């Protein structure tokens, strides 16, 4: 409907309508006066007959024959070729025979109006078209007009624009506080000028995708009470040279005229990347645009009252001149929300969605660590879609569980049929991941195991921490590598012929091992040094611009260390599965019976599990001996019970995001009936053989340590 009204408002439709009316008028003007059109042959027959005729008129030029038999019978036709000579002779004969009163020939020529119309109509049409094009260029210069490619494409917020407020934003309170202060700057500038404070010229919002950067900007637009100009970074660069800089100038001119005002540039990294990179040189179009942006923000001629808010996912590629104080005075990180933030986000998005009485949003928040606001909104939307698909009145826990699985791993492949052997291999593969994760002390809890195909996986083991973790220890990294290799080790142990299903596990484990050696300085042989430059060329991709800053000999040492770490993790996983073969078989039997096992069901199966001990101390050198003095006790926090039992979730960092992957420890459950000594070492790294569990009738009479004081080999390292 809007497109139709836009078409009828334009002049083009009226021009075409006028031309059509003129053609119709000329058509009807040339006909009429009561004459009936007849074929040429019939007209010639009438003239050659002996009927009495009142008059005949031959009009040259148009070659028209008009025959009047009487007042009620008038005919019109046309002659062709040289018929006129024959017609004239016949008409003269009829006049002599007195069967025709008279005839006349006419050669009137064209009328002056018709001649003018035919000669000048094409020029009139061309002139009207150019007038329309120029009018469109002036009226739509900023919206893609012919002459308006240098105009800004910014959208200006109006009263009719749907508004978001800070009440619609949750999970990033620090960013909200900073942006609310920007709103106060614009509303009450005297309050800040009284103490000598200056209004910030720019605010940069950066963080992972889906954390709410654009939503924060919309909230500022909804509450600022000043004109709000929004534009994407990619809108500045077009096919014409200089368009980007022209649009920057036009954008700031519009904002200055409407000051105080706010400009929001989304994805500013499209124009704000490092200058001098890539193949464009100093005359690259993006560089001209960036230079103009730098001048407008803090150049020679700057007027106050305009605040620039920008958002990006990659602050590392932005030009340093853009980030300095005086341009982007504030740089606000918008990270993935913590537990409390996720709960608030779920409450915001649950508004208007009917929930069952037993739905606990706090439980959903605990089960979704690492998810962004967009992920959580997608979870609730998927749950609502599943509820509507099943024609249910309210959203229940089962729909929310399925929604979480769909967001993490994709929809279930109900039509994919696997034979029993493939299902058995998948069950042992996922069971190997889960068992090794539960046996290692530094892994995350196993939340769910399934052998139902979902997404691109034949099955998956969901491993997530019970609380938010922001770092990882060396022991946790090594344990995570062991559970990543658990699936491959299980296939080798059981089927003696591993499959290709562990390719993604090997990829993840290799990344962890290489980061452990080259980034984190956690290899005793390489030392505490970062190898490999992390700087990248903005126009050459993520890693194409990286340079190796170490020798070939060091590269060989790195490769050897990575291989050794992977081999140790692989062997630890194999030994762990071998020592817990009965538990692994029971887990597979339960997977075949139920197809999906929850956290509580897995904990029940793993009660007799033989768990691996903690790793020994690591300092990277024999010269650095760790202290035996324990750390100080942190101060008491009001409202926190220091003596309350801790939730058994080990620390977890950014290495393994909350995606379906193998592994996990089970917090809060009782240990198995047998555990090796705390300093026991698996045979894979030089330790002794797995000791037998003590006899239940004679507790404490298990195998005794050797007399040399080294009970079961060197501690885990």
From Swiss-Prot:
Binds 1 zinc ion per subunit. Its cofactor is Zn(2+). One of its GO terms (cellular component) is plasma membrane. The chain crosses the membrane at residues 10-30, 112-132. It is found in: Cell membrane. Zn(2+) binds at residues 429, 433, 505. GO terms for molecular function: ATP binding; ATP hydrolysis activity; ATP-dependent peptidase activity; metalloendopeptidase activity; zinc ion binding. SUPFAM superfamilies: FtsH protease domain-like (SSF140990), P-loop containing nucleoside triphosphate hydrolases (SSF52540). CDD domains: RecA-like_FtsH. Residues 31-111 are extracellular. It is a multi-pass membrane protein. Residues 1-9, 133-717 are cytoplasmic. Keywords: ATP-binding, Cell membrane, Hydrolase, Membrane, Metal-binding, Metalloprotease, Nucleotide-binding, Protease, Transmembrane, Transmembrane helix, Zinc. Coiled coil: none annotated. Its EC number is 3.4.24.-. Pfam families: AAA, AAA_lid_3, FtsH_ext, Peptidase_M41. GO terms for biological process: protein catabolic process; proteolysis. It is an enzyme of class 3 (hydrolase). The active site is at 430. In the central section; belongs to the AAA ATPase family. In the C-terminal section; belongs to the peptidase M41 family. Homohexamer. This is ATP-dependent zinc metalloprotease FtsH. It comes from Cutibacterium acnes (strain SK137).
